[in-house]
Amino acid sequence: MAKLHEDQFHKILDGQIEEAISWQEEHYSRDRKRNYEAYLGQADAAPAGRSQAVSWDVFETIEAALPDLIEILCSGDHIAEFEPVGEEDEQFAEQATDYINYVVMKQNPGFLIFNTWIKDALLSKIGVVRAYWATSEKVTTKEYTGISDDDLTQLLSAEDAEVIEQSQQDDERDVAQRAHMRAALNVMDPMQRQLADAYLQTPVRQVYDVTIRTTRKRGRVYVDNVQPENFIITPRAKTMAAADLVGEIKSLSRSDMRELGYDKEKVREIQSFEAPQDRSAGIAQTATDESHDHNYDFDSEGDDATEEVRVFDGFIRVDYDGDGIAEWRRVVRGSNVTLVNEEAEGHDFAAMSPILIPHSLIGIALADPVVPIQTSSTAMQRQYIDSLMLANNPRTYVNTTAGVNLNDLLDNRIGGIVRGTQPMQTALAPLLTHNVADSALQGIEFNDSKREARTGITRYNQGLDADSLNKTATGVAKIMTAGDRRKLMMARIMAETGIKDLFRLLLRIVTENQDKP
């Protein structure tokens, strides 16, 4: 089988990317946007003059579950441990455990990464992180004055040291010492005079003024959160390992691409991939995307350095070399130009869902079963408030022929006077309105119990157990235990999927790239 031609490879890649984007838009975008809006307390506005109250069930559920999940997964000495296969592996496993945990929690902002990762999973069905090796350069420039040959040699022996400026002159101390010797020659004994003459015949010692620039290259592992709405994967993939396409659609400025070392001509020509339609569904409303969502009109002489281009940055498994075996390749591509196409050991993403669906990588978000309850509770709260308002300020029938002063009637001051010319019984009558406040409260309580049954997040394991005094100690303990088990189950799923994959990925990256401590 012949090696894939570039056009064939691009056709396969573009087709898989388009399929993955379409699959996400069709199956997940609407739910994700709905969940984020519910989490932020956004709801349809009621008619003017009616209650605009919103129930925050999704927010309460997510924020109640998050601290416990963080504590379960991140509070120990080690987030994860590597187990030795045999006795000869014990030392390596111990070192790998210590170092990879150090990479996650110390070299990277581990707590913030896990906080975002878990919250993404609870809200968006899937949380995604990406681990990769990157090299950074630290350039330092120092000036040295009056250093010797030996000192200069030692400075230049440092890795990546470069002399920018250099000048030399006689060492003033050596010049002064020689003058002192010449003045004392007449009083020296023959042996001392012979040594002094020999010294005076040598060249004057030189000293140097130099400016040295040192460039230190240091590589390390980075772990970044990936916005779920930007993440794309082979449709219907059952696991991360089973996917043939894994990546993200992200925005890079042309300046960023040039700094990353991509071909300048390709950077000039590259055009954007069409982004997933639900990019605005993120918690931050993807403010940065909106700020760049303009129709730039750059001419050939204009500065296009800040223009944002949406590119696919990810991995595809394909038989590129024609040997009959599909291999992973890392690709960075716009809609018309490929910036990177290189062989890779595997992809660098790790993903997890809090509630698994059999035979599917992307499961159910904790927010999914709560959103309908929030919609119902919002309606109940509004009816409760509207009912109280109508009870305290009922509508009134007015006999317009009874001489009632309407201005007095509409002025709802406490102790106010309403003037009229006929008895009140014949002039005014309240319109009967059924008070549904009690029924609305019962509906809200029913919704709360349904939310607890669906999520396992109860008022007892949230610390909101004011009426637990009316329960038996055994009954409350059973409720708390059931809720804790649901959270422990979610934590176990996250540990067995995304976290385990992340630590395996980090060990592979460190083993491949780390050349010094």
Language-model features and meaning:
Residues 1-517:
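Extended alpha-helical, oligomerization-prone segments that build pores/tubes and scaffolds
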